[in-house]
Amino acid sequence: MAKKVKAIVKLQIPAGKANPAPPIGPALGQHGINIMGFCKEYNERTASMVGTIVPAEITIYDDRSFTFITKTPPAADLLKKAAGVTSGSGTPSKSVVAVISKGQLREIASVKMKDLNAVDIEGAERIIEGTARSMGIKVE
């Protein structure tokens, strides 16, 4: 028989830098799971991606055990890294903070493909292009 799911917690944590301090401690502690166990396992899985934010979806069961999956970094972070900016535009419809190429867009879309609700790479590119537009990043 399958375990009964108690909660699903979604967190965005810097890769390789999970520790029991907030926001991880309070989010997981209220469900009674071993926070250090999660932090060690997360840091091992994300050791190769240090410097990026890696979302984790933690499934907590009634017997206080847990499983988690790591996702790809947020599209906004990948776009900021590709464009070489620290933040998006405050007024994206009026001012452009950076320009990225179609090649960079395709590369980001291929990385994000497994987490996006897109059938093909062109659909994924359109989703990422919309995110770029809302950040004030122009695609040429």
From Swiss-Prot:
Coiled coil: none annotated. SMART domains: RL11. GO terms for biological process: translation. The keyword Protein biosynthesis does not apply. PROSITE patterns: RIBOSOMAL_L11. One or more lysine residues are methylated. GO terms for molecular function: large ribosomal subunit rRNA binding; structural constituent of ribosome. GO terms for cellular component: cytosolic large ribosomal subunit. Keywords: Methylation, Ribonucleoprotein, Ribosomal protein, RNA-binding, rRNA-binding. Pfam families: Ribosomal_L11, Ribosomal_L11_N. CDD domains: Ribosomal_L11 (cd00349). The keyword Ribonucleoprotein applies. Belongs to the universal ribosomal protein uL11 family. Part of the ribosomal stalk of the 50S ribosomal subunit. Interacts with L10 and the large rRNA to form the base of the stalk. L10 forms an elongated spine to which L12 dimers bind in a sequential fashion forming a multimeric L10(L12)X complex. Forms part of the ribosomal stalk which helps the ribosome interact with GTP-bound translation factors. This is Large ribosomal subunit protein uL11.
